[in-house]
Amino acid sequence: MTILVDTNIILDIFMDRKPYAEEAKTIMEKCVDGEIIGYLAAHTIPNLFYILRKAYSQKERRMLIRNLCDVFRISDLNAEKIISAVEKEHFADFEDCLQEECAVEVLADYIVTRNPDDYRMSRIKVITPGDFVKLL
């Protein structure tokens, strides 16, 4: 099974956001074990680096990003995907639309997110971490 993991799931882990962190950690562990193939969208990486700046030093953030790249595959972003996302006016959030473009590219079975309503028009099935963990 292949999934694209939304940025908020990774933030749940690194910021230990209760009660979401445990389900997020379970998903990450399944990716580490190779039970599922996990992807992050390319733009998730700089977003994480920026958002985590208040909680982690630059050195720590670099190590976290390096470790993420060992666990997850990274879906590329190119001009074609960006233009496709820009033209989808039915997606209110441009960043979510980019995530969906990346999920389509990698043939993901699911986009795992805590914000499923943001993906109502997604071509890929969307699932919450809790519901995804129940599938495992």
Regions found by a protein language model. Give the residues of each.
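Short, well-structured N-terminal submotif of metal-dependent ribonuclease cores
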Residues: 1-39, 53-60, 121, 135-136
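Acidic, PIN/NYN-like endoribonuclease modules and their adjacent C-terminal/linker elements
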Residues: 2, 104-136
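Short, flexible helix/strand-to-coil boundary loops that buttress conserved ligand/catalytic motifs
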Residues: 14, 86-89, 123
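Active-site-proximal, substrate-binding regions of enzyme catalytic domains
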Residues: 25, 45-47, 52-73, 80
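Active-site neighborhoods of divalent-metal-dependent phosphate/nucleic-acid chemistry enzymes
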Residues: 73-116
